């Protein structure tokens, strides 16, 4: 085994291995499935008769330590350690529910005959490049394995119950005089019994799949791979030269025709109708002719295929049980699992990803029949680093851990009907972000739901209402407000949006009015920009006074419309900011603003968040912003346009916004607002109303099967969209935990919170 991953399997035979990852096939729309299937057929047709290739699917129980390392949350010796440890225990419990201890990996190994390594290397590298490009064509991630990685696969196959991790380096090999086999071999091999074998303290059995079914289905391989046990499935595939394949089939057609003639002669001699011949001959004759037609005119090739299964267990009884389970799946699809009697050693070697088949049992299949063993099922989402918990994969029961920062565009949406668990999902993410990252978190809370959670983490709740003494100034600006030399341009956009909410009717602001506002904005900031001290920060009243001084009639109309917000009963936003916004966790509670001011409040909060994002950018710090009732910002054209613009800008500035809404129709009200979807690589979709389901299916290209996960689904169930990955999820959060009481907004849980002595919003 060379460092570069090229293995000399036998004299004159060399191979390489590529690991590839899953894509969503079982959940895909039929047309997408067909496209994947056709691509897979083209992929198989790439291999000519000089290349032997092997598909390996390995399910093995891994050491849980590596998973526990990903979800481990360390104490930080602060007042939140109790909640931190409670969340960590919840993650461990969820990990135990899933199959994360069972690792499923997929490989393709390809080999060629060559006189020496110098001849083999360029050929193998060319094939490797072609395979990687073919995988890339249908969105499959793949990478070639080096020598140590290939050896590790074999070590883990031979030493399944050994807790000692694989340790190997080529430098050690030179120093010790050992060879690669010494590093991977188990303590012993025993092939005494013809039906099974022993390696170390593991017992195993190798079987082959006898393909009897007249038609195969793409679900068969997927069902084998869903088994919750140690299992290696290997498909050895050898392409037959096209001319040889056609010649072979023609000779079979000739043989069948000869047999027909013999039967017809026999019929004539016996005095009965010469058309009455054995039905099998007619059947075989028709099939052989169709096969010949496929090879000659339908882009089909002929392959020799061997499907080998290696089951392993700790004892004989357990082994017989898993072999019986495997055989049951084969039987379900009208095939048979046959034990390789007295060929267990050859079977074991054929089960290693070496690209060599030592089993003489082969079945001839066309491209389409071979491609029915589609190697794709469903994707998993389990990332390291600062990954956040999003529930369990509804198909595999594995933990879903994802880091939105790794996406090209981390902006996100949480969509769902009332009661589907939208705000709970947002609070769960906020909690997870708070305890494992250093990110700032800002919440716009139109319903007053987030108070208990924010207070539990010593966050700052800024309650904005006509009677409150907490003020934020919509005119606040800082020098970093925009990424060019003119921060006033973006601020002017914001003030235009604000004035549209205040003044604009159905048609919004007139062009003349926009010009007047823009002029006044530039004038009102002159003193502050010349000497940027807090005392010179303008307030709405300064803008109002400037509008009054303008000569145009429209400026008087604008000023009159602003008057109620400056001198009237809605003057809550005519003050300088008097609250510190330096806390890591800030919640703007705007529940008491009333209908008239709520949209305005949300817009002003959004601007305050933008100010925070611009400051944090300089400190290389991420800012997460959660906007509940997000649809309220999208109803007026100018505020929608401003929100879309901010949504686009957030990514570049280290902001990670999350819109939470039940009104999908508002999100798709115009082509411009649709940009929010296009600029959001993360969507958490919970139960959806019938009309919204159809809209989303069209917008996000969701299959009917995928839609079933957001149709009358339970609380905390749905689909997660992470980049190009779509996974059905479920989250059954332990309702006995303190965190659950802090996050839930159900009336019965509010009562439980009160019994635990946790203050609610109205108790503060």
Language-model-detected regions and their locations in the chain:
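Post-Walker A helix-loop "phosphate-sensing" segment adjacent to the P-loop in P-loop NTPases
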Residues: 432-442
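Hydrophobic positions on the alpha1 helix immediately C-terminal to the Walker A/P-loop
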Residues: 425
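A short helix-turn-beta junction within AAA+ P-loop NTPase domains corresponding to the substrate/partner-engaging
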Residues: 458-462, 672-685
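P-loop NTPase motor domains
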Residues: 23, 30-49, 56, 60, ...
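Hydrophobic anchor at the beta1->P-loop junction of P-loop NTPases
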Residues: 414
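Extended, folded cores of ATP/NTP-driven motor/assembly subunits in large transport
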Residues: 1-378
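Conserved P-loop NTPase
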Residues: 700-756
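Conserved lysine of the Walker
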Residues: 422
